[in-house]
Every structure is written in structure tokens, then in C-alpha cells.
A protein has these predicted regions:
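Sequence/structural signature of beta-propeller domains
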Residues: 31-531
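Gram-positive Sec-dependent secretion signals
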Residues: 9-15
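Cleavable N-terminal signal peptides
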Residues: 19, 30-31
Length: 531
């Protein structure tokens, strides 16, 4: 039985649920935006979940747009775990946003689960007020995809002849693609397969499809890189078993070849004996190349790809998160590696391995890598070096960059969002919450310009849960340059408020008892002068 979106949040699972719901009051409804303009669209009344960071320049503006649980007059409800964001401007005073929701019906942890599978919203926004005029599903929950993280909208700038949105499953579970996604048993669904795929959406036609040849792994993002004769899409493995992450490139002749999955997958290999994160130190600058991945491996399961990568000495990062290309030199690519405290050298092989629980190794904070692709051949890497490295500062240091996750670039800056591990979280008031950092290309300055505000946690007006997160327990995500809408320095981003439980309801998925929860969150815009 598929779970699909409906006007009522609870209606999405009526056939599955039993019990009495606990629902927090969300102070948002289908009302006009601030200022009283009835045509300006909906704006949330939930307080902003971001504040200026410790190093923010004067003039930062933070404007919340829509919060999890907000419902429009159409019945559309903004769902939990908002993540990747892409946008277009349509020239009629409106902009279209595509917003991922990293939801899943596969319980984790324990018996806790979301109300929906992952899905992508299309939000139509008033360009002047940033109010939401309408909203629909671009990729619905009943497509049975899981945990969409970042997304990327490829278009003419990247060599595509039409706009294709790439969205990505960060998941390893076996799920039914028809019927009820989980449990993957014939009694409730069919077409079972392992998750971890890339999904392409033609935003004009509305058609979407899986691109299996892009590889099955924990995709954080798939980013098209401009400037080559063929289309090049880079992706990284945001593995759940770090350190065992790789960087891949999908190369195809044109947009139709991508859409019809006629391209080929390639994997990055370092040269001169450099084959993992631990081999590279500050000041090192290595070369490398991409090698072809056999088609049967690329479309196989995640274990097959991991086994093949090890056998072929593919460079092992710790845990690649987002990717962004330089807006001035598009063959320069930035890679966020979130690090892993349990990553330690294997005494038998010298390569990194995962230590036991409680291990505190030398890589707790992560790095930003800088990769330079050959201008004429995207399979050749002229340089791989470390741009930012805060691993040596150790865990729990307030001034360190903690576990970089999402990235965005402008002509001036690299924007970096943190997803802090427990080792980099603090008692409330004793250290920062998760931040957004700005790295200024001209000077190399790194400054914290935004910070997540967790003050709504356990507010009885919003939260029916009983757990208070430590500082850093919430994260911001999905940052994207919004200068096309509002001018330089403007960004769209969202907040995932994992311990802000708006709704909790016991029920069943097939024969399995679960607890459905809706976590809080928010979509915002922010102005950062000089960014």
C-alpha cells in the first residue's frame, strides 16, 4: 500500500496508523505575507531558526519563509527534514524552488520513522516578498525514494540543453519501489531494490527517472561541472561506514545521453602512492585520474561498488558530503569531507580503517579539498590539495570548523554548512550551535556568518518531544546562491531541527509497530554582505 501526500498530514498514513496523536501547534497558516499584501503569498510566523554568527559582518538579514507543519490554503503542508534547494526565476515576479525532504519510511533509529518517503517540493515564490504562492510535489512520496539529501539543477551553464534536477538518495536500505516501501516484503509491496541512486527530474515536463549508471552509493549530491565537450557530473559517497568514501564522475555526450543513462561512471585514483585521506597532509599537492567503472558494477549494489573500488585502489576519502565548482574557474572543484573520529590507520595495510566505538582518531573535524580538473580532459586531475584543514585542532574546539557538509560558491566566497558530530557538540551555552562559514577567496579568511538558533527546542507551543539537543544537535543545510532572485549576497537555506518534535503517533508499517514523528525545520533566506 503506497503512502502518498494528502491535505492532512495525518491522512498520509491513515491506512497504517492506530493510536492517538500528539501534535504541537504550529503558528503558521495560509495567511498573507508580512506587510498585508494579499498577493504576496504565505510567510511563516514561526521565529527564525538562524541568527547572525560570531563573525557576521554588519547588515546580515535573516528572513524565515516557511516552517515544517505550515499549511497553505490548498492543503499543502511543508514536511520535515528540508534539505537540498534549487531555484529558477521565471521573469514574472516569481521564482520556483525545488526543495528536498530527507524523509524515509525505513525506521531509524529503532522504531522511529517519518510520515513519508522522501519527496521534492516545487514552491512558487513571490520574488518581492519571498512569500509562497503555491506548492506541489515534483517527485512524490509514493515514488518510494529514500532520504533525498542535496540537489543540483543543471542547465545551459553546465552544458545541458534543458534543465535537469539531480536529487540523490543517501540510503543503503532495500525497499519496495511499488506499494509500501518498507518492510520490503511481498505482502506490502513489490519491485524491491537497494536504495542509493540518483534521480533526474526534467523540471519542464515534470518527468523523473532513476539514473542507475551514476552508481549506487550514499549520494549526497550530483553536481554538473561546466566547460567540457561532454557533460560531466561529479558525486561523492556520503558513506555510513566511514572511512570508505570515493569521488565519482559520470560522463555523457549530451543531455539525452544523461536522461537515457547512456553515460559511463568513472572513479578517482590518486597517483604517486597517495590513496587515502590520511596520506594527504597540509601543503601536499597531488595529481590523479579517473578510471572507468564497469557497467555491471555501476548498476549493482553498494557492496559491489565498494569492493571494486578497493580492488582498484580508488582514492578513499573519509566521507564526502557536498561538492561545488568555482564560479571563476569552473574546472576547480571543492569537496567537503566531514571527517570521522573513528578513522585510524590500519596497522596491517596503512590505509584508514574504522576503529571501535569511542575511538578518537586524528580526523575529527573534516576538511575542504580543492580538486583541479584538466581543462581539456575531465578524467585527468591536475591537482588535489587541502584548502581548509581543522583536524589538527582536535574535537570540541569552539573556533574550529566542525564537520563540513553542504557547500555553495559565489565569485567571492565558499559557503560551508556544518553537520556536527556528537564529539563537536556542547552543553547549551558552553559552545556554538551548527554554523555557516564563509571562506573569502581573496584573503583566505574563514568566518562564522550564521548560526542555528535552537531556542524553540522543548518550547511547549511547538515541541511534544522530551529530548533537549546539545548545541550543534540541529543543523542548517541546502544553501544555494539566490542572487538571481534578490541580488548578490542573498542565499536560500534551511534548518533541520531534529529534536523539535511537532507530531508523534504510534502505528504500523505492514506488520511492524513504529512511531511516526515529524521533526521541525524551516526554509529561510539570508543576506550576507560581501558573500
Amino acid at each position: 500500500m503506497p503512502v502518498s501526500r494528502s491535505a492532512s498530514p495525518r491522512g498520509r498514513a491513515l491506512a497504517l496508523l492506530a493510536g492517538v496523536a500528539l501534535v504541537a501547534t504550529i503558528a503558521g497558516s495560509a495567511a498573507a505575507a508580512r506587510g498585508g499584501n494579499a498577493n504576496a503569498g504565505f510567510k511563516t510566523s514561526v521565529p527564525a531558526m538562524l541568527v547572525p554568527g560570531a563573525d557576521a559582518p554588519a547588515g546580515v538579514v535573516i528572513d524565515p519563509i516557511i516552517s515544517v507543519g505550515d499549511t497553505l490554503n490548498s492543503g499543502f503542508t511543508f514536511d520535515s527534514i528540508p534539505d537540498g534547494i534549487s531555484l529558477t526565476v521565471n521573469g514574472r515576479g516569481r521564482a520556483d524552488l525545488w526543495v528536498n525532504h530527507e524523509t524515509s519510511l525505513v525506521p531509524f533509529p529503532g522504531i522511529l520513522t517519518d510520515f513519508t518517503n522522501s519527496h521534492v517540493d516545487r514552491l512558487v515564490m513571490n520574488q518581492h516578498s519571498a512569500g509562497i504562492l503555491s506548492a506541489t510535489d515534483a517527485i512524490p512520496s509514493d515514488a518510494n525514494y529514500q532520504r533525498f539529501c542535496s540537489n543540483f539543477l543543471a542547465g545551459p551553464a553546465e552544458g545541458f540543453d534543458r534543465r535537469i534536477l539531480f536529487t540523490n538518495e543517501e540510503a543503503t536500505d532495500v525497499v519496495n519501489r511499488t506499494g509500501l516501501a518498507w518492510p520490503a516484503i511481498p505482502a506490502v509491496g513489490s519491485d524491491p531494490e537497494q536504495a542509493g541512486v540518483v534521480v533526474a527530474l526534467d523540471i519542464k515536463s515534470g518527468e523523473y527517472r532513476t539514473i542507475y549508471g551514476m552508481g549506487r552509493h550514499n549520494h549526497e549530491n550530483s553536481v554538473a561541472i561546466p566547460g567540457f565537450d561532454e557533460l560531466v557530473v561529479l558525486s561523492g559517497d556520503d558513506t555510513f561506514s566511514a572511512p570508505s568514501s570515493q569521488v565519482y564522475s559520470y560522463i555523457a555526450s549530451d543531455t539525452d545521453a544523461v536522461w537515457n543513462d547512456e553515460g559511463a561512471l568513472w572513479a578517482f585514483v590518486g597517483e604517486d602512492g597517495f590513496n587515502d585521506y590520511g596520506d594527504l597532509a597540509d601543503g601536499d599537492d597531488i595529481t590523479g585520474h579517473f578510471i572507468p567503472v564497469p557497467r555491471d558494477v555501476a548498476v549493482g549494489d553498494q557492496n559491489a561498488l565498494e569492493t571494486w573500488s578497493n580492488a582498484n585502489n580508488v582514492f578513499q576519502f573519509i566521507r564526502i558530503e557536498d561538492i561545488a565548482y568555482d564560479r571563476n574557474d569552473s574546472n576547480v572543484v571543492y569537496l567537503a569531507d566531514t571527517g570521522e573520529p573513528r578513522a585510524i590507520p590500519d596497522p596491517a595495510t596503512g590505509r584508514l580503517m574504522r576503529g571501535p566505538s569511542g575511538t578518537m582518531g586524528p580526523y575529527p573535524n573534516g576538511r575542504i579539498f580543492r580538486m583541479v580538473l584538466d581543462e581539456d580532459d575531465p578524467t585527468q586531475v591536475d591537482s588535489l590539495s587541502i584548502l581548509i584543514n581543522h583536524d589538527p585542532l582536535g574535537p570540541g574546539v569552539a573556533d574550529a570548523l566542525h564537520n563540513p557538509d553542504n557547500l555553495e560558491t559565489t565569485a567571492n566566497s565558499l559557503l560551508i554548512q556544518e553537520d556536527t558530530g556528537s564529539h563537536n557538540q556542547f552543553d547549551l551555552g558552553a559552545g556554538p550551535s551548527a554554523r555557516v562559514w564563509q571562506y573569502i577567496f581573496a584573503t583566505g579568511e574563514l568566518r562564522a556568518v550564521l548560526e542555528v538558533d535552537q531556542s524553540l527546542d522543548e518550547d511547549p507551543a511547538y515541541d511534544v518531544g522530551g529530548f533537549v539537543a546539545r548545541a550543534g544537535g540541529w543543523e542548517s543545510s541546502g544553501i544555494v546562491d539566490a542572487s538571481a532572485i534578490w541580488g548578490p549576497g542573498w542565499f536560500l537555506l534551511d534548518v533541520q531541527a531534529g529534536s523539535l518534535i511537532l507530531e508523534s503517533e504510534p502505528g504500523f508499517l505492514g506488520p511492524n509497530p513504529v512511531i511516526f514523528e515529524r521533526e521541525g525545520g524551516q526554509l529561510l533566506r539570508a543576506y550576507i554582505p560581501g558573500a
